[in-house]
Amino acid sequence: MAITASMVKELRDTTGAGMMDAKKALTETDGDMDAAVDWLRTKGLAKAAKKSGRTAAEGLVAVAVSGSTGVAVEVNSETDFVGKNAEFQEMVAGIAQVALGADDTEALLAADMGGKSVADTVTAKVATIGENMGVRRMAKLEGDIVVSYVHNAAADGMGKIGVLIATKGGDAGFAKQVAMHVAAVNPASLDEASVDPEMVEKERQVQIDIARESGKPEQVIEKMIVGRMKKYLSEITLVNQAFVVNPDLTVGEAAKEASAEITGFVRLEVGEGIEKKVENFAEEVAKTAKG
């Protein structure tokens, strides 16, 4: 496969690797972007990084909460300009309200919204606004306490990132702080028990390859892997992450102090999969939560 300059740039943006290293990684992996990231990590040339996808969507994520139920819905548009359009925002807010009564995206698209289906409503809006758009996905969360948070809000209840948090015990104020944390840190799972086993095994193999590159004895490598996997799991699971509001505590420890149990979370980001550089994002959210 021919390795293009744009592929090299994408890999460099994702991993921070040098130009020649990025090109070699792509050559060694026949242009497979995800495999190239792992190749660079194995060689110690890149930090663990989320793989950048190919989604190029704009639009908004809207959140809505009613009692013990919360929903987050992503509605895409072709340009960011449409996301600022009041007519588009009104439609997105309405779709989020309808989503409270839907079980999944398919049901949402078929649900009634002012006398016609959500799908037909969106189609009509395409004709009015003159730009392609669509409901990409929805997620639902239930719990004793459910709160929502929107980061980079474009209007009330909608923005670029939408988060839902469900807790048992505690109060809405603490749950809101956890929602801000999730927006900033983007955990993969709630706890170790809910982590995808395939993801863990893939990371374990990468760490084994990295350790073997060091040339250390196998028994030393085994101990290294145990420590590295423990660190990895603490970084990707919500309850084990350092709380952005108070980094001296993990989120789980903070929940215990607040007499709360976090039972679930949802985080949707517009165009999920695109790697976007946001400087001091966690610091920004921590200040907002404290303020």
From Swiss-Prot:
SUPFAM superfamilies in the cross-refs: Elongation factor Ts (EF-Ts), dimerisation domain, UBA-like
Subcellular location: Cytoplasm
Domain of life of the source: Bacteria
Gene3D superfamilies on file: 1.10.286.20, DNA helicase RuvA subunit, C-terminal domain, Elongation factor Ts, dimerisation domain
Segments for region (Involved in Mg(2+) ion dislocation from EF-Tu): 79-82
Record bears the keyword Cytoplasm: yes
One annotated Gene Ontology cellular component of this protein: cytoplasm
Transmembrane helix recorded as keyword: no
Coarse class of the protein's main subcellular location: cytoplasm
Keywords: Cytoplasm, Elongation factor, Protein biosynthesis
GO MF annotations, alphabetized: translation elongation factor activity
Function in brief: Associates with the EF-Tu.GDP complex and induces the exchange of GDP to GTP. It remains bound to the aminoacyl-tRNA.EF-Tu.GTP complex up to the GTP hydrolysis stage on the ribosome.
Family affiliation: Belongs to the EF-Ts family.
NCBIfam families reported for this sequence: tsf
Protein name (record): Elongation factor Ts
Organism: Jannaschia sp. (strain CCS1)
